[in-house]
């Protein structure tokens, strides 16, 4: 399994200096996020803070949505009724042979294959 992808809540926790998120990120050499996560992080910030946040999250490799990811997201959405944006986030990790690290057990059940929930708040 290659280096993981991080869900929006873990990235936001890291930006907010939560020690649990920091500890999780230090475990891995490479930090990847879906373009959807990148968008969700920026969407949660006031316009005047976005450039600073964009620079900080540039430490993450951002993986763009392509046809394989879109097809996998459609399959996940159909099978699980997961919200479409969450399906895109999970599909990005799966198509790239990785796990998704999240603390969002509401939308990503911890027992679902390919999900790692290292902490909850």
Describe the predicted segments one by one.
Residues 59-79:
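Acidic catalytic patch
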Residues 10-11, 37, 69, 88-89, ...:
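Alpha-helix capping/helix-boundary segments
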Residues 1-33, 42-58:
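Short, well-structured N-terminal submotif of metal-dependent ribonuclease cores
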Residues 28-30, 59-61, 94-99:
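Short active-site oxyanion
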Residues 34, 38, 50-53, 66, ...:
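A general structural signal for well-ordered alpha-helical segments in protein cores
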Residues 18, 90-121:
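Acidic, PIN/NYN-like endoribonuclease modules and their adjacent C-terminal/linker elements
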């Amino acid at each position: 399994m290659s280096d993981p992808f991080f869900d929006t809540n873990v990235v936001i926790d890291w930006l907010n200096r939560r020690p649990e998120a920091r500890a999780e990120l230090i475990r891995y050499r490479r930090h990847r996020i879906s373009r959807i996560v990148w968008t969700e992080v920026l969407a949660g910030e006031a316009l005047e803070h976005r450039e600073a946040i964009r620079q900080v999250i540039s430490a993450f490799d951002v993986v763009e949505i392509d046809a394989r990811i879109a097809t996998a997201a459609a399959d996940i959405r159909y099978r699980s009724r997961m919200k479409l944006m969450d399906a895109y986030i999970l599909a990005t990790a799966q198509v790239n042979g990785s796990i998704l690290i999240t603390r969002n057990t509401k939308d990503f059940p911890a027992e679902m294959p390919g999900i790692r929930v290292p902490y909850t708040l």
